[in-house]
Amino acid sequence: MSDTISKHDLMSVCTVSRETIDRLEVYAGLLEKWNSTINLVSKNTINQMWKRHFLDSAQLWPHIPSETKTLVDIGSGAGFAGLVLAIIGMEKSPNMKFTLIESDSRKCAFMRNVSREINLDVQIITKRIEEVTDIKADVITARALATVSQLLEYSKNILKDNGVCLFLKGNACCDELKIAKESWVFLSSQSQSITHATGCVLRLTEIKYAS
């Protein structure tokens, strides 16, 4: 899949306008520029960034409940998936509040630079996830961050009681779910990733500690 095709796929997956793609192209240009001096993403993925990073992140959008008011992306890195979702949200859900949590100050500086360039209103917190306790999210997202068990630990202090977790996972997802169920009770569903043959979008709801 070429990057050109991936741009069209992104427009189709999220039914976004050319204006949103233009904002993402500004993001892509800054990513390429910054990545030459700061390791934001693997240099091997830059030539396929629209598929490997932008489309991969954007595929979460259709899974976000329409009534969502607050979305928190944990371990945002260079903005995948949270910054991509926030850019889509500018068009699709302008009243939704996005918060991105990332402990690396350089990556946060990059995300703030992107946000300024495209006039994106997003909260970026430079802290470890477990240090953030003063926000509550309807939806928590994460991409390539940790095991399901660890993601639930990260989420427990910031997810609302009726909240939803959306995680991009790889081929170890089923094994991770079995381990997570030793400590947690939840409902889960998986949707095939559109960017990785062995990947999925994992949706968790009704999350509680196992008694």
Give the location of each predicted region:
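Class I SAM-dependent transferase core
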Residues: M1-T68, V72, S105-I118
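Conserved SAM/SAH cofactor-binding pocket of Class I
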Residues: A58-A142
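Short conserved AdoMet
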Residues: P65-S66, K160, K181
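Short glycine-rich anion-binding loops that position phosphate/pyrophosphate groups of nucleotides
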Residues: G77, L145-T147, N171-C173
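A short helix->loop->beta-strand "cap" motif at the edges of active sites that frequently abuts
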Residues: N95-M96, D161-G163
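A short glycine-rich, Lys/Arg-flanked "PGG" loop and its adjoining helix->strand segment in the class I
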Residues: L152-N162
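Conserved beta-strand signature within the Rossmann-like core of class I S-adenosyl-L-methionine
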Residues: N162-A172
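Active-site capping/gating segments
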Residues: A172-S211
